[in-house]
Amino acid sequence: VKNGPGGTMQLVGPDGLVTRKFSFTTLAEQKCLFDQTRVASATAQLSASGTVSSQTVRDLTPILICAVPKNTTRFLGATLPDDYLEKDLMTEDGVLEIDLSNGKVADRSPSVQEGVDAISIKATEEAIYFINRYNNKLYRLLRS
């Protein structure tokens, strides 16, 4: 993973070539989490007798979870990260889960009526947790 100016992130393969490029703006320290999650994958084996058996293997996969502001125009006149930390700037976020091994992006945004300004992101194999700065409540998003 390489970070670039202007909110760009590049996934780089073992050969040094860029495999996927993302562009989004967020406050990485407050709104992102690098995680490793266990992902199930099935393998099939053929026995000497000709029967096929399958086995589920759970591999560790590197994941980036970020709360991404839906509108960043308010960032233009802000002093970052100070205005954000002092709550002079609030955001309304979507939540993205990016599999860093293949670049697959899953939108995990909560379906709630009130705004979500997500901080303190944590994750388990089953769920993503965060605090909403608008109401100081803990939220849980199930991972499917």
What kind of region is each of these model predictions?
Residues V1-C32, Q36-Q45:
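Acidic, serine/threonine- and glycine-rich low-complexity intrinsically disordered segments
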